[in-house]
């Protein structure tokens, strides 16, 4: 129960963190996307635009979780983790794959599971992005593995400039999460295709 509450606390923190950015991002995105559609002179495909919009919003969420500063009237602008700590892991540079697992037991015993939240979060963080990107653009699995690793590498390198930890394990789990999201997207497409084939075809002249 404590672990679930901790997960909810982190989600609540990052949801509130996004609010100032959403107020700026949504109008700019709609304006830019509208101009792009008008310039192309082609009819808008609502479902495709909806998926693109969700992908853009989720990309903003990833940035809010990883690199964007907290903006609030009471605290001003600051770069930090959510309230709490992941323990000894929560600092510096870590370049040994699998080293993060050493802190799971310590975190579960003394810190309420913060490290486990981070591990699951790193694995799941890129999964929705992989799913939405697959639904928007398709592509091969290795492209998503490389994209996940590349995006995560950029984030980890940028975090060298911030009071946050830079960890090779984050990159690994982010890339695997992106790949997992890709396969979820493919699975969804296949299920939707089978469902479409299973529906009875409309007889010409009906209705």
Segment roles from a protein language model:
Residues 1-164, 182-207:
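Bulky hydrophobic segments
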Residues 78, 165-176:
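Non-cytosolic membrane-interface motifs at loop->transmembrane helix junctions
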């Amino acid at each position: 129960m404590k672990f679930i509450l901790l997960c909810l606390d982190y989600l609540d923190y990052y949801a509130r963190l996004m609010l100032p950015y959403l107020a700026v991002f949504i109008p700019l995105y709609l304006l830019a996307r509208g101009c792009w559609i008008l310039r192309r002179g082609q009819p808008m495909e609502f479902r495709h635009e909806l998926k693109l919009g969700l992908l853009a919003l989720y990309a903003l969420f990833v940035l809010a979780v990883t690199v964007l500063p907290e903006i609030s009237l009471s605290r001003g602008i600051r770069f930090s983790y959510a309230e709490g700590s992941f323990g000894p892991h929560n600092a510096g540079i870590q370049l040994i794959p699998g080293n993060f697992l050493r802190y799971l037991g310590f975190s579960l015993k003394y810190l309420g599971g913060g490290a486990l939240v981070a591990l699951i979060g790193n694995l799941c963080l890129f999964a929705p992005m992989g799913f939405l990107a697959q639904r928007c653009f398709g592509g091969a699995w290795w492209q998503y593995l490389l994209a996940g690793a590349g995006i995560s590498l950029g984030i980890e390198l940028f975090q060298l400039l911030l009071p946050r930890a830079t960890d090779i394990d984050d990159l690994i789990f982010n890339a695997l999460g992106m790949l997992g999201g890709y396969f979820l997207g493919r699975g969804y497409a296949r299920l939707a295709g089978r469902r479409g084939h299973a529906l009875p075809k409309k007889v010409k002249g009906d209705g």
